[in-house]
C-alpha cells in the first residue's frame, strides 16, 4: 500500500466478517501471552468528557508487528436522538512506519473480542466443553456472546434469563439463527445442570446471588465501574478468582472491588493459559477488557484480509 492508496474502512457488517470467532479466539490466546510478557504495550484508557454526560475513550496499543488505536464515544442521550449510544473506530497502523492500514467499526470490535475473551476463559478454566451455559441479560453483549459461544461450543445448550420471561423468549427468537441451541430459562431458578454462568447486564447491583460451587464457572462481563457489581459479594469471596487484565481490573472490576478481595490472590488469564493456576474449587472469571485485545482483533482482521488477497 502506497501513501496515496485509499485506506480501507470497514463498517459493522464487514468488520464482523473479518473477525470470525475461531480465528479471533486463537489470536487472543497469543495476545494474552504477549501482553503478559511485555510484548504488547497497552496503557490504561484515557477518558475525556463530552457534552450531555458523554465520554470519549482513547485506547492505544502497540506490538512489534502492529499498532492500534480505538477511539470510542459513549453518548447516553443518543437513544432519544435515534442514534447509537456507542460510536467509534479501531485503526490499525504499521508498527515501524506508522502508516495507517485499515479501520474497523469500534463497537463491533469491542463486542466480538469481549465475547471471544469469555470463550477463551471458559476453555481455559472449565476443562471439558460446557454442556449448559446460562446467559444473564438480553442486550447487545448477550447477543454477541450467544453467537460466539454457539460458534466455539456448538454442542452446548445456551439458556437465557432476562428481566422477564417475555424478554428472554423474544431474545431467543431473534438470535436463534446465530445460536440454534438458544432457549429461554424455564422460571427464575437456576438448574443444577448449568455449568457456566455469564452475567451480561448493565445492572449496578447483583443479578447472580447463588452460592459459589465447584463445577460451575461464573463469568462476569457487564459491570465495568468500581461501584457496580453483577455478582454477589459472598459468591465472589468464596470463589477462586481470575481476571483478563490485572492492571485494569483493579480500577474497573466492580464485582471484585465491591467484595473487597485480596488482589494478591487474584490470578490472571495468562497464568491459567500458562499452566500455573490450579483450577480446583469454585471459579470466577472477571473480564474488563483492554486495548491489547483490540490489537488481537486487528491481527485477526489483517490475517483475514491477507487470506482474501491470496485467494
Swiss-Prot record:
Organism per entry: Azospirillum brasilense
Enzyme class, broadest EC rank: oxidoreductase
Subunit structure: Homodimer.
NCBIfam families, per database record: PRK07340.1, PyrPipCarbRedLhpI
Pfam family, one: OCD_Mu_crystall
EC code(s) of this entry: 1.5.1.1
Catalytic activity: L-pipecolate + NAD(+) = Delta(1)-piperideine-2-carboxylate + NADH + H(+); L-pipecolate + NADP(+) = Delta(1)-piperideine-2-carboxylate + NADPH + H(+); L-proline + NAD(+) = 1-pyrroline-2-carboxylate + NADH + H(+); L-proline + NADP(+) = 1-pyrroline-2-carboxylate + NADPH + H(+)
Name this protein carries in UniProt: Delta(1)-pyrroline-2-carboxylate/Delta(1)-piperideine-2-carboxylate reductase
Keywords from the UniProt entry: NAD, NADP, Oxidoreductase
Disulfide bonds: none
Similarity comment: family membership: Belongs to the ornithine cyclodeaminase/mu-crystallin family.
Pathway note: Amino-acid degradation
Function: Catalyzes the reduction of both Delta(1)-pyrroline-2-carboxylate (Pyr2C) and Delta(1)-piperideine-2-carboxylate (Pip2C) to L-proline and L-pipecolate, respectively, using NADPH or NADH as the electron donor. Can also catalyze the reverse oxidation reactions, albeit at a much lower rate. Together with LhpH, is involved in a trans-3-hydroxy-L-proline (t3LHyp) degradation pathway to L-proline, which allows A.brasilense to grow on t3LHyp as a sole carbon source. Also appears to be involved in D-proline and D-lysine metabolism. Does not show ornithine cyclodeaminase (OCD) activity.
Top-level taxonomic group: Bacteria
pH profile of the protein: Optimum pH is 6.5 for Pyr2C reduction and 10.5 for L-proline oxidation.
MF terms in GO: delta1-piperideine-2-carboxylate reductase activity; hormone binding; pyrroline-2-carboxylate reductase activity
Gene disruption phenotype: Disruption of this gene leads to loss of growth on T3LHyp, D-proline and D-lysine as a sole carbon source, indicating that this gene has dual metabolic functions as a reductase for Pyr2C and Pip2C in these pathways. On the other hand, there is no difference in growth on other carbon sources, including T4LHyp, between the wild-type and mutant strains.
Induction entry: Induced by trans-3-hydroxy-L-proline (T3LHyp), D-proline and D-lysine, but not by trans-4-hydroxy-L-proline (T4LHyp) and by cis-4-hydroxy-D-proline (C4DHyp).
Amino acid at each position: 500500500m502506497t501513501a496515496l492508496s485509499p485506506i480501507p474502512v470497514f463498517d459493522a457488517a464487514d468488520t464482523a466478517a473479518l473477525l470470525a470467532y475461531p480465528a479471533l479466539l486463537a489470536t487472543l490466546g497469543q495476545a494474552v501471552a504477549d501482553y503478559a510478557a511485555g510484548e504488547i504495550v497497552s496503557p490504561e484508557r484515557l477518558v475525556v468528557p463530552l457534552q450531555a454526560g458523554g465520554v470519549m475513550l482513547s485506547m492505544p496499543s502497540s506490538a512489534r508487528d502492529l499498532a492500534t488505536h480505538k477511539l470510542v464515544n459513549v453518548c447516553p442521550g443518543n437513544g432519544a436522538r435515534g442514534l447509537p449510544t456507542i460510536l467509534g473506530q479501531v485503526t490499525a497502523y504499521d508498527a515501524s512506519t506508522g502508516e495507517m492500514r485499515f479501520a474497523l467499526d469500534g463497537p463491533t470490535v469491542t463486542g466480538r473480542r469481549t465475547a471471544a475473551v469469555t470463550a477463551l476463559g471458559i476453555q481455559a478454566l472449565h476443562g471439558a466443553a460446557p454442556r449448559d451455559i446460562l446467559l444473564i441479560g438480553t442486550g447487545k453483549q448477550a447477543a454477541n456472546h450467544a453467537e460466539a459461544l454457539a460458534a466455539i461450543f456448538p454442542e452446548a445448550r445456551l439458556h437465557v434469563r432476562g428481566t422477564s420471561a417475555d424478554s428472554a423468549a423474544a431474545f431467543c427468537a431473534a438470535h436463534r439463527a446465530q445460536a440454534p441451541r438458544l432457549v429461554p430459562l424455564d422460571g427464575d431458578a437456576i438448574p443444577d445442570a448449568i455449568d457456566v454462568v455469564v452475567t451480561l447486564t448493565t445492572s449496578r447491583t447483583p443479578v447472580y446471588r447463588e452460592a459459589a460451587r465447584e463445577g460451575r464457572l461464573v463469568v462476569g462481563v457487564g459491570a465495568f465501574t468500581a461501584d457496580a457489581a453483577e455478582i454477589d459479594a459472598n459468591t465472589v469471596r468464596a470463589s477462586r478468582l481470575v481476571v483478563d487484565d490485572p492492571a485494569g481490573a483493579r480500577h474497573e472490576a466492580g464485582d471484585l472491588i465491591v467484595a473487597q478481595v485480596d488482589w494478591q490472590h487474584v490470578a490472571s488469564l495468562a497464568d491459567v493459559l500458562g499452566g500455573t493456576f490450579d483450577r480446583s474449587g469454585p471459579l470466577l472469571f472477571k473480564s474488563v477488557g483492554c486495548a491489547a485485545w483490540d490489537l488481537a482483533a486487528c491481527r485477526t482482521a489483517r490475517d483475514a484480509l491477507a487470506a482474501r488477497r491470496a485467494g
